[in-house]
Curated annotation (Swiss-Prot):
CDD domains, per database record: ACT_ThrD-II-like
Protein name: Uncharacterized protein MJ1601
InterPro entries recorded: ACT-like_dom_sf (IPR045865), ACT_dom (IPR002912), ACT_ThrD-II-like (IPR044561)
Domain ACT, residue spans: 3-80
Pfam hit, one: ACT
UniProt-listed SUPFAM superfamilies: ACT-like
Source organism of the structure: Methanocaldococcus jannaschii (strain ATCC 43067 / DSM 2661 / JAL-1 / JCM 10045 / NBRC 100440) (Methanococcus jannaschii)
């Protein structure tokens, strides 16, 4: 048995959509816990316990779950995704914020962005919520260093 902890958008039909890949690859659903009372940031935590007979099928199920928009948090209690809150200080907008986001999205996903622009001549700041695979954190931190040098920005990281 495999326990998969995911997060889904809090809207009708999301749970049904993630059950399709499980069925498609012949896995059996043992249990589902849909914790709406623990909703955070418009996302609902869901724990699905499945019985699947080989690792290739599990890999395909996980890939399809992500294609369906599920954020896979843990597999059998092991972290798969890490959330980072990153404060970016500098001329965030003037140094092409779209490019910065696109480059981060090649490694992880900028899930949320709050931008503060006090005055066009002054530095701005942004708070980014980034979701990244645990094994790609070092690559993301290296990108932050590149962006700091290239764009004169400062990235302040917080992992949870």
């Amino acid at each position: 048995m495999i326990t998969i902890d995911i997060e889904l958008k809090d809207k009708p039909g999301e749970l049904l959509r993630v059950l399709t890949p499980i069925s498609k690859y012949g896995a059996n659903v043992i249990s589902i816990i849909h914790s709406r009372e623990e909703k955070r940031g418009g996302k609902v935590p869901v724990r699905i316990v499945i019985d699947v007979d080989d690792k290739d099928k599990l890999k395909k199920i996980l890939e399809d779950l992500e294609k369906e928009g599920a954020i896979i948090k843990k597999i059998d209690g092991k972290d798969k995704k890490v959330y980072l809150d990153v404060v970016v200080i500098g001329h965030v907008v003037d140094t092409n914020v779209r490019d910065t986001i696109d480059r981060i999205n090649e490694i992880g996903l900028v899930e949320d962005l709050d931008l503060i622009m006090p005055h066009p001549d002054k530095e701005s700041s942004a708070m980014m919520r980034i979701i990244v695979d645990e094994d790609k954190i070092e690559e993301l931190f290296y990108l932050f260093e590149e962006l700091e040098k290239e764009k004169g920005l400062l990235f302040i990281k917080s992992i949870f």
